[in-house]
């Protein structure tokens, strides 16, 4: 599966950035429950692993909350490759909003 890596810089303390990312994941589980069949995440310090399925697609990846940026690494199913730039910009926009 093709991969996608998105970096977004932030000016927050690392713990606050982590809190915001984790809260956004919890919110997404509820807000998008009609589109997401399953969203699982597990955290070890400042690194989170996730698996998601919905709308006929499955994906997985990692989120790293670093002192000055957040990095999302994920796989994209071949069937969704046409939407790679849209997925990337959606992740970037969401992270930018969360970390503002």
Predicted features and spans:
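Generic beta-strand structural signal
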Residues: 41-43, 65
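Hydrophobic residues embedded in beta-strands of well-ordered beta-sheets
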Residues: 46-48, 70
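Terminal, regulation- and interaction-focused segments at domain boundaries
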Residues: 1-20, 24-39
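Hydrophobic/aromatic beta-strand elements that line small-molecule binding cavities or substrate pockets
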Residues: 59-64
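Amphipathic hydrophobic-ligand
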Residues: 55-58, 87-89
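Short beta-strand segments that buttress and anchor functional surface loops
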Residues: 48-54
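Eukaryotic endomembrane contact-site and trafficking scaffolds
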Residues: 54, 97-98
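C-terminal structural segments of small proteins and small subunits
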Residues: 65-97
């Amino acid at each position: 599966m093709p991969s996608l890596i998105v970096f977004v810089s932030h000016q927050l303390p690392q713990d606050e950035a982590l809190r915001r990312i984790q809260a956004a994941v919890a919110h997404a589980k509820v807000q998008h429950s009609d589109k997401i069949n399953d969203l699982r995440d597990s955290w070890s310090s400042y690194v989170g692993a996730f698996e998601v399925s919905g709308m006929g697609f499955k994906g997985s990846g990692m989120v790293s909350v670093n002192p000055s940026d957040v990095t999302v690494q994920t796989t994209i199913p071949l069937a969704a490759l046409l939407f790679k730039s849209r997925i990337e910009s959606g992740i970037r926009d969401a992270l930018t909003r969360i970390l503002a």
